[in-house]
Amino acid sequence: MAPSLDSISHSFANGVASAKQAVNGASTNLAVAGSHLPTTQVTQVDIVEKMLAAPTDSTLELDGYSLNLGDVVSAARKGRPVRVKDSDEIRSKIDKSVEFLRSQLSMSVYGVTTGFGGSADTRTEDAISLQKALLEHQLCGVLPSSFDSFRLGRGLENSLPLEVVRGAMTIRVNSLTRGHSAVRLVVLEALTNFLNHGITPIVPLRGTISASGDLSPLSYIAAAISGHPDSKVHVVHEGKEKILYAREAMALFNLEPVVLGPKEGLGLVNGTAVSASMATLALHDAHMLSLLSQSLTAMTVEAMVGHAGSFHPFLHDVTRPHPTQIEVAGNIRKLLEGSRFAVHHEEEVKVKDDEGILRQDRYPLRTSPQWLGPLVSDLIHAHAVLTIEAGQSTTDNPLIDVENKTSHHGGNFQAAAVANTMEKTRLGLAQIGKLNFTQLTEMLNAGMNRGLPSCLAAEDPSLSYHCKGLDIAAAAYTSELGHLANPVTTHVQPAEMANQAVNSLALISARRTTESNDVLSLLLATHLYCVLQAIDLRAIEFEFKKQFGPAIVSLIDQHFGSAMTGSNLRDELVEKVNKTLAKRLEQTNSYDLVPRWHDAFSFAAGTVVEVLSSTSLSLAAVNAWKVAAAESAISLTRQVRETFWSAASTSSPALSYLSPRTQILYAFVREELGVKARRGDVFLGKQEVTIGSNVSKIYEAIKSGRINNVLLKMLA
């Protein structure tokens, strides 16, 4: 048995989530090191691993109790075959509910012998015609009035995505399989036949308030399987996508329309399946975006030469043991293991030794587990809620208790549980976006990015503004995410003769959440593009430093060796010159190459004069050293750059600096997607593929799910 939602919420409130019993059917005990707080906590990685492991080719058997969200996604997006489980118990429950309803046809039964909603004061003995009347008034959505729009490649902008309709059909069959709804097995098989033959009803995008379930959208599904003459469907036949009337599509596959019996129209349309389907798909994508956000955070730490200590277990497991904060910190810590960019251990220094150096990373990196942890908690909770809603719930009305031979009039169709998960998820998406946006802008800002070139220009910044446009675009995406985060559920209007005076607006909220996923995908694709460029530029910097360290010593010996004879000034001079150069170079990363190095050594010359003031040093020697050192640095920089770019065409030298796990994402983008680091059109003297086209490749990999297993491999 799955735990109740109350028990899940209670365990979350105590930092001990039992949601895994609803999601995985099992528990994992995680001892929190040093905190003395044993927890039973499903992790987000567990959830994603299970979702992505859902098969796509084996038949999904629906029994009303075991459907999980990965199954819904595989049926909705991958066309996984679906059927009602071949079980005597299931057939018996369904048959008994139908028989019980038939025994009540002389009684006043809502939606069987009465009218609907605020019209439930009407009565009829024509139960079959009543179901037709139900569909008639609910088939009221706006779709193209002719096939011309479809032929011109338009017409679907006001219809639900086909994957949402397929997911809704899967969830609805699963719910009706429970035998609480008096809908015959032949009707369920009509739905699975549509799914398995790739016949998908065209359903209006708008027009439901998700109160008595999603009445109008589900009516279009019911109309299609019953062969309504004006019902349109999408089908793939002989390798071609077509929009046909439902009867035409059924004829292609020798399918017969079903005639809906008493309550069967109501049993099909009165439920939360459409909202639950769109919410499930939105949540699946939100999980993936959350993992991508964590991965980008780790890679930004690397690009910014940030501190792995921000994710130390003492900070999270011991001193603030929120389970999802622990998880996020652990994920990022794992991603940084073995990185040569990230600072893993920092020696304590005296007050004056690191003057002018930022002592710790800024909030977007340092507090990312504390920021993302609560959002991950909301996603895990939403997963538990939707697992119950899609896999273990009957959501129409009235419901039949076969064992006790009674019917119950209630409101399981009120989709507030779904709506609330979407409200929280959408708010979380905006907060994820805000975090990644601030990480991105810090990385692009020459005054904050620890010496990376302005706008991540690979060559002279005066003629390359590489990521400046992306900076602006990212601000637009983040602003839109903030707007979309506004609540939907506060905009309820009384409807249907004020009978549905409160309504969940779950599908509208799920639609807005799907939009947020899309916008966040754009933002994270932008971030990923930029962080890889930053990593490449940081690798060039590190390669340069390896070679320039000995060169500095050699130049100092060459120009000042005689002045330092018999003294202990050499080591002091080398150390102070290096510090002066590092500090000045970080302040001048918007300069072009040549003036930047001449400026840096002009500052370093002052350090030379200061250290060697007690010697016989001449100003001519200092000036000669200054010019020679600057020219040497300029020459070496160009040499290192050329070596890097030549090697990057095969296997980038940056890989050796990244952690083994972040190497996976770097290689996926650079090699599999073919998005290369950019030197600049002006420098190369030709116009290359646009920046936007390269970001688009990453965006498409996110939207298609191509990146999903890459992220799981990184975090497994």
Curated annotation (Swiss-Prot):
It is an enzyme of class 4 (lyase). There is a cross-link at A211-G213 (5-imidazolinone (Ala-Gly)). It is found in: Cytoplasm. It comes from the Eukaryota. Contains an active site 4-methylidene-imidazol-5-one (MIO), which is formed autocatalytically by cyclization and dehydration of residues Ala-Ser-Gly. The keyword Lyase applies. Homotetramer. Dimer of dimers. Optimum pH is 8.5. InterPro entries: Aromatic_Lyase (IPR001106), Fumarase/histidase_N (IPR024083), L-Aspartase-like (IPR008948), Phe/His_NH3-lyase_AS (IPR022313), Phe_NH3-lyase (IPR005922), Phe_NH3-lyase_shielding_dom_sf (IPR023144). The gene is PAL. One of its GO terms (cellular component) is cytoplasm. This is Phenylalanine/tyrosine ammonia-lyase. (E)-cinnamate binds at N270, Q360, R366, N397, K468, E496, N499. One of its GO terms (biological process) is L-phenylalanine catabolic process. Its EC number is 4.3.1.25.
